[in-house]
Structures are given as C-alpha cells and as structure tokens.
Design a protein with these regions (language model features):
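Internal alpha/beta scaffold segment
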Residues: 153-195, 214-242
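Rossmann-like S-adenosyl-L-methionine
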Residues: 2-7, 18, 22, 217-444
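Short, solvent-exposed loop/turn elements at beta->coil junctions and helix N-caps
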Residues: 116-123, 194-196, 424-428
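Terminal RNA-binding accessory module
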Residues: 1-75, 350-351, 358
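Short, acidic/hydrophobic/Gly-rich beta-strand patch recurrent on exposed beta strands
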Residues: 22-27, 145-148, 337
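Short, aliphatic-rich beta-strand segments
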Residues: 201-213, 269-273
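Extended interfacial segments that mediate partner engagement and assembly in macromolecular machines
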Residues: 59-71, 78-187
Length: 444
C-alpha cells in the first residue's frame, strides 16, 4: 500500500487530531491530513512517513462531510490558524468535546459523565481582543500576514476574521501610516525593519507595540500614529534574536501615550501592559472567571492562585473569598497586579513574587489553604508543583487548562490524593482546535 509514495492514495477520515487535522489509517498506521474532516473520504499525497505515523497533503475530497462549509477567509488553508473554519460551529464543538473526552479517558481514566457540555462562544468570528502578526512585503508595501504551518513561507493577509472588527480597522490604519513613512519588513542581514505588529484593544482604546530591529522610528510617524482615534499607547520592542521563543525583546520603550491599557471587568479595572497575559476572548474569560468563583464557593476561604500573572483571576475572586494570595515569578506582572489591587481599593488580595512551587510549599506549612487555583502554561504543572500539591492538605484545587493532553496527564498524578469533581470545558477560540477546561479537584 505504501509503494508509490507521492501518488494519490485514498483514505477515510475516522477522527480528528488535537491540532484540527483529520486522521485516517493505511495498513493500521495513522495518517494525519490537514483540511480533512471526520467521515470524509479523501485523496492524499503522502508527504512524510516514519515507523509510527504518516502525514498527507489533501489533494481532493471524494466524499464530503455534510458538516463542511465554505470558510469566510480566503487564506484559511494556507494560514492554518483556523483549521475548523471549514465545518459548522456545532460540529466544531463536538470535535472539541470529543478531544477532551478521549484525552481524559486515555490518560486519567476519568468518568466521562463528569464532563459537562462545552460552553459555546457567543461570537464565532471577530472575537479576539489582540493580534500578533508578522510583517512582510507585498508589491512594495508593508503588510501583515501569517507563516504557513511548519514553513517560512509568508502569506499576506488582507483581513483576519477572528480579530475584533475595531481591532482590524485600527490595524489597517496603522499599516497605512507605516507605509506612508516607508517602513519596511525586517531584514535579517541589516537587523532593521519591522518584525511584528502587536495590537490589543478594549472599550475602543488600543495599545500598539512595534517589534523591530535596532532603529529609531521617525518622530513624524510616531506623532501620526498617536493621533489615530483610539490610540491609547504606543510601544517599541527591539528583538533581533532569530531563534528566540520570546516575541518581545528585552528592550521595551514607551513611544507615547499611557503605560497601561485598562480593561473593565465588572467592578474591577485591570491595567494591561504589552507583556501582560489576558485571555483573548473577553466574553468567555468573564464567563470562566465567574465559573471559578462559583467553584470556590465558601466566602470565608483562603484562596491561593499560582501562576497569577497580572492577577485577573485573583481580582475576580476578591469578593468571593476572605483572602486571596497570588504567586507569580515575573516581577513586572507582580508590580502590575499590586498596582491593580491598590487602584481598585482591594485590601484582601496580596501578590508575591516567587517560584510558585516553592512559595506554595512554604504557605501550605504556615496556613490552612482552602482553595488553590492553577492556570499553568500549555506544558501543564511540572513535577515540583505536582509534588507540593500532593504533600499539602489543600482542600480543593481548581485547575484551568488550555491543553487537554497535559491536563489529563496531571490529573492522573493528582488523583492519588484528589477526586475529580466537575469538568467544565469552554470554547475560547472558535474555528481553532483549542479548548479551555476548568476542573474541580477535592481532597480525599
């Protein structure tokens, strides 16, 4: 069956992969096919094969899924950021629910009946409050775009349909100004030019960061950008390291405007800096924070939030708990969070700058912690944090995850001392394969 590699081969797609690709089987070997949907029969060209799996390029669809739709985005297939834009929204939710279900069963042996129906996003398009787009050149002009998956091929973008509409309007206005001043895309040899345009918006106000080489932008251009309606702050970040995983460079300069962009969440005002992490779907973030507050429950509780960042979750819990302690290792984020608590007149929340596992171990020996909230990166909780949680006597853990695989593997460890309670998935990123999940764990 594998002879004639590169020629058309027929595959029936049996399920969806964690990155939104279709998975079929040839001689019992899984074949990953981006762009194919569950139930479809497709013709592919095999592009890669090893001892465990193969990858295929979709040539044509022989039998279409009834759930397939025409994507609104003309570069959807080449961009690769929104693999589920080719199927209707109900099917997207079903895929995500099933991905979470299979992962929890496989790694953590969780009773799937505990998984509640995924909370859909009110918006399926135009929902992202931030864009982080690379820059390139097209027909002599500076443009934004995306790189094709697993390549250095730049695909110019006219409109991104998952960014909020006013964010897209502002992005295009910024590009016009940059082109009027003949700003060019980054040149690796000269180490000059613009690498990324980063834009975040709340309540009609915008924070723009230009990630560039070592150069000084024209003062006339800066003045013109700051004069754009809604421009709240303008930053420059110098990043010349080619292989750095960090989007921002070590050098950040405020070119004009206010240092922080402010987000109103109920009665709380959150100051957001360019490096601050905040969920990209504002409405779903508010819904998730409300769910976490509900799970905390007891208004007399001591709550500790590990990896607290700028303190968004901690702030959301300040009126739910008697005392909240946030732990974050990034100093700027801690200073940001402390300023937020001070500006909002909140006196029952404190933020500590420390390694999360080390400080949690110390606190758990000194205090009786009722609830621990963890919202780790995609890599999940490390061994040190898992060990501290298991050794502690924390009554309840609320685990917020953006990765079903690492979540499930962590739960497999934590179930040595904790019982899994409610499992609440949220669709934070419509048209992508990603799913956010909140899991309640109760100490036995």
């Amino acid at each position: 069956m594998w002879e004639g590699r590169g020629n058309g081969m027929k595959v029936t797609i049996k399920k969806m992969g964690i990155n939104g690709e279709g998975i079929g089987y040839i001689d019992r070997m899984p074949v990953f096919v981006p762009g194919a949907l569950c139930g479809e029969e497709v013709e592919i060209t095999v592009t890669e094969k090893n001892g465990r799996f193969a990858k295929g390029k979709l040539v044509r669809i022989l039998r279409r899924s009834p759930k397939r739709v025409r994507p609104i985005c003309s570069i959807q297939r080449r961009c690769g950021a929104c693999p589920y834009m080719v199927c209707d929204y109900e099917e997207q939710l079903r895929f995500k629910q099933e991905d979470l279900r299979q992962s929890l069963i496989k790694y953590a042996h969780v009773d799937p009946r505990k998984i509640e129906p995924i909370r859909p996003s009110e918006k399926t398009l135009f929902y992202r409050n931030q864009c982080k787009l690379p820059c390139g050149m097209a027909e002599g002009e500076l443009v934004n775009g995306m790189y094709m998956p697993n390549s250095n091929i730049f695909v110019p973008m006219e409109t991104c349909f998952v960014h909020e509409k006013d964010l897209e309007i502002m992005r295009k206005r910024i590009l016009k100004v940059l082109n009027r001043h003949q700003i060019r895309a980054y040149d690796w040899h000269q180490k000059r030019g613009l690498r990324f345009l980063i834009l975040r918006g709340f309540h009609g106000k915008f924070q723009c960061t230009l990630v560039s080489g070592e150069e000084e932008f024209p003062s006339a251009m800066i003045e013109e950008l700051l004069a754009l309606e809604g421009m709240h702050s303008l930053w420059q970040s110098v990043q010349t390291q080619k292989k750095s995983a960090e989007l921002f460079g070590p050098k950040m300069e405020l070119l004009g405007g206010e240092r922080y962009l402010h987000l109103q969440m109920g009665e709380i005002t959150l100051p957001i800096s360019p490096r601050s992490f905040f969920q990209l779907n504002t409405q779903q973030a508010v819904a998730m924070y409300a769910c976490i507050a509900e799970l905390v429950g007891d208004r007399n509780a001591l709550v500790v939030e590990a990896y607290s960042g700028i303190g968004g979750i901690s702030m959301a819990l300040c009126r739910q708990a008697e005392e909240v302690i946030g732990i974050e290792i990034v100093k700027d984020a801690v200073l940001n969070a402390r300023a937020c608590a001070r500006d909002n007149g909140i006196d029952n929340v404190q933020f500590l700058c420390a390694d999360a596992a080390d400080k949690l171990l110390y606190l758990s020996k000194k205090r009786s912690i009722d609830v621990l909230v963890v919202d780790p990166p995609r890599s999940g909780l490390d061994e040190a944090m898992l060990a501290v949680i298991l050794r502690s006597k924390i009554k309840k853990v609320i685990y917020v995850s953006c990765n079903p695989s690492t979540l499930s593997k962590n739960l497999a460890v934590l179930q040595d001392r904790y019982d899994v309670g409610r499992i609440l998935p949220f669709d934070m990123f419509p048209n992508t394969a990603k799913v956010e999940t909140i899991v309640e764990l109760k100490r036995r």
